[in-house]
């Protein structure tokens, strides 16, 4: 199902005991076809509280994932490989926010997610090697933006950064 904004939704009828109603789902298509399993294993290796829950392969293609799911920090995600031309690839229209309690966490997630061909962007944004967009954000941001006058200085600092530096934000505050 596609909504009026062009966002695709997959509706699944399941058991009543489902863990969460909305499950972010990655569809690996075109040049990314066949990378769903690799991506699931990569994300599970990056996040500390994570595991692959299930992987079901296509009977006629053991390299492609018909459906797989995995958890990251107790949140369920799904991944699939889709054959054929789909005319899209991952982009910044959808991103995942990782809230970090300190600079060590920011550095950890930034370095892991940009490894092996990922790309840095501005303001705490990055793309991993599968072109999935992430925002690596310090959990202190709401507090630093709560004072309207100081918020402008903090945002000016953020706009100059790729990876967020908490000490620099606190200095700007």
State each model region's role.
Residues 1-4, 32, 37, 45-46, ...:
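Vicinal oxygen chelate
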Residues 2-12, 18, 73:
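Active-site-adjacent scaffolding segments
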Residues 9-11, 55-89, 134-138:
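Conserved short beta-strand elements that form part of the metal-binding/catalytic scaffold
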Residues 10-58, 93-95, 140-173:
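N-terminal beta-strand motif that seeds the catalytic metal site of vicinal oxygen chelate
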Residues 18-20, 62-64, 90-92, 118:
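Residue-level preference for beta-strand/loop junctions
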Residues 23, 67, 122-123:
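Conserved beta-strand and immediately adjacent loop positions that scaffold enzyme active sites
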Residues 25-27, 71, 80, 97:
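Residues in well-ordered beta-strands of folded domains
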Residues 41, 67, 110:
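Short glycine-/small-residue-rich flexible loop motifs, especially phosphate/cofactor-binding loops
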């Amino acid at each position: 199902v596609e909504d009026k904004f062009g966002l695709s939704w997959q509706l699944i009828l399941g058991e009543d005991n489902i863990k969460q109603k909305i499950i972010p789902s990655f569809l690996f298509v075109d040049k990314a076809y066949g990378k769903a399993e690799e991506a699931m294993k990569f994300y599970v290796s990056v996040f500390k509280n994570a595991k692959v829950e299930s992987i079901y392969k296509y009977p006629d293609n053991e390299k492609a994932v018909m459906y797989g799911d995995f958890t990251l920090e107790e949140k369920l995600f799904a991944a699939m490989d889709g054959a054929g031309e789909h005319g899209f690839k991952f982009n910044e229209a959808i991103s995942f926010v990782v809230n970090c309690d300190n600079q060590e966490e920011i550095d950890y997630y930034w370095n892991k997610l940009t490894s092996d061909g990922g790309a840095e962007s501005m303001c705490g944004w990055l793309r991993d090697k599968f072109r999935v967009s992430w925002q690596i954000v310090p959990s202190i941001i709401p507090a630093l933006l709560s004072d309207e006058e100081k918020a402008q200085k903090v945002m000016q600092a953020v706009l100059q950064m790729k990876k967020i530096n908490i000490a620099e934000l606190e200095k700007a505050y």
